[in-house]
Amino acid sequence: SQPAIRACAEIMVKASTLEKDGFANLRFAALANVPAYAPFFPAAYSAESQPTFALALEAADLAIQAFSSAATLAAARTALISEIEANARKLEAVAEQLQNIYHYDFKGLDFTLAPFPKEELSIGTALQKLGLSAVGYQGTLAASAFITDTLDQAKFKRCGFNGLMLPVLEDYTLGQAAAQGTLAVSDLLLFSAVCGTGLDVIPLPGDTSAEEIYPVLLDLSALALRLNKPLTARLLPMPGKKAGDE
């Protein structure tokens, strides 16, 4: 609802002042169409009283490994599916053991390709391995769709997003693209139509108002509802920072 969206925008602005670096907003996300049991920290919730668990993977490195040695898109797809399914089998076996020991309900795996802040563990790097000259240029949407379509074809017990995470503050290559002006919030919103989690850890100027954040969240919600997919937003106004500051 619009009141809920506006409330989220106001919370993001207020939370930005709770810590000097503005990182309190790492622990708050606006959710749109997100189901229960998604193992994504700020969006996770349960719909029942019984203890449950799910596993989320920072699996950008699997994509980089799969794409680095692939000569064609078909080979890249096959390699990534193979990597995901091989790792899923190992994780599911361990999770099922834990389920039997502790009687917690195992909901599944979220293989959303999430990065770690190193170039060799960057989802932006994985996208460029598919032939992009730079993330944010034309072709990024198609490359993003290729990855999420590949994830859809892998076979494992699913929960959560199982898509593509593009967190600017947590990804070396995406951060470089944003700093160089080739990757903007409008681009990330466009990619959300084919990706996974939406707008994640996007730094904003410290003086960004709730009135400026509100329409961004409104657009994200419209995408989530129109496309019937889960999306989230973690937007971080950075105290004392302006556009272009480091």
Model regions: which residues?
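Anaerobic metallocofactor- and corrinoid-dependent redox/one-carbon enzyme cores
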Residues: 1-246
